[in-house]
């Protein structure tokens, strides 16, 4: 089996899982690129990225440029390593053409959509939000564009009706190593394929997008909630307060149930009418509170006054 010298670039959990799996292969990880350490939490403690934690555990050189313009010496450090290939997944820093030109086989990006669909920052969320039944993993030869490079390998992944962005993220984290290792094994003979079809773009998520529109269908709302779980969380406004939603189910609606109205509130759930069904929320999170089952909320809060209230 072919043994390649690899520089790895990534930052969050999904990248860390791929890196862990790559360490279990025959390939040699020469260095790891990841974003600079950040101060996080109330105590503003410095935290390493998940990728840096994995690299340190495996005694690998870690490079953390703020950017390649501000830290151009990092490019020279990578050149000196003479990597066969650079593997990139969710690195989060723009790389210049001279970075792409360093390795013998170029730079491979692991992108979690079936390109050219959902190019950009939030392919997992946008695929669920759109109601797609399938998505996938593309191993792409990086070029100067935004996810525009030729495709070297793909793996289709089904989107279940219960999938959230978190569950789909976790699937991708486990599955990404398979098409990557296949690509590395066949890198001398694989024929890059130009992307086919009309591109769509997965624009960055904003917190405000979590707001639920109950005039839509229950299916659309289900996709919306699952797309924005766990972040930024789907929510509705109740008398000026933001209420985040948790677990839910879809029920049949009566002809006299008004769209956007709160139909009923019992220990079983908080029922809101959409344009075709009822969504029963089994969990809600009121401001400055934890996410709780409706039965637990009712133990300390009177919600009956909201029956008949129209959302939005």
Curated annotation (Swiss-Prot):
PROSITE patterns (UniProt xref): GART (PS00373)
UniProt keyword annotation of Protein biosynthesis present: yes
Coiled-coil regions, chain positions: none
Binding site for (6S)-5,6,7,8-tetrahydrofolate: 113-116
The keyword Oxidoreductase belongs to this UniProt entry's keyword annotation: no
SUPFAM superfamilies, A to Z: FMT C-terminal domain-like (SSF50486), Formyltransferase (SSF53328)
Gene3D superfamilies: Formyl transferase, C-terminal domain (3.10.25.10), Formyl transferase, N-terminal domain (3.40.50.170)
Reactions the enzyme catalyzes: L-methionyl-tRNA(fMet) + (6R)-10-formyltetrahydrofolate = N-formyl-L-methionyl-tRNA(fMet) + (6S)-5,6,7,8-tetrahydrofolate + H(+)
Keyword set, alphabetical order: Protein biosynthesis, Transferase
Broad enzyme group: transferase
Record-level Gene Ontology MF annotations: methionyl-tRNA formyltransferase activity
Cellular component GO terms, alphabetical: cytosol
Family (UniProt): Belongs to the Fmt family.
Entry-linked NCBIfam families: fmt
Protein name: Methionyl-tRNA formyltransferase
Species whose genome carries this gene: Francisella philomiragia subsp. philomiragia (strain ATCC 25017 / CCUG 19701 / FSC 153 / O#319-036)
Lineage summary: Bacteria, Pseudomonadati, Pseudomonadota, Gammaproteobacteria, Thiotrichales
Gene: fmt
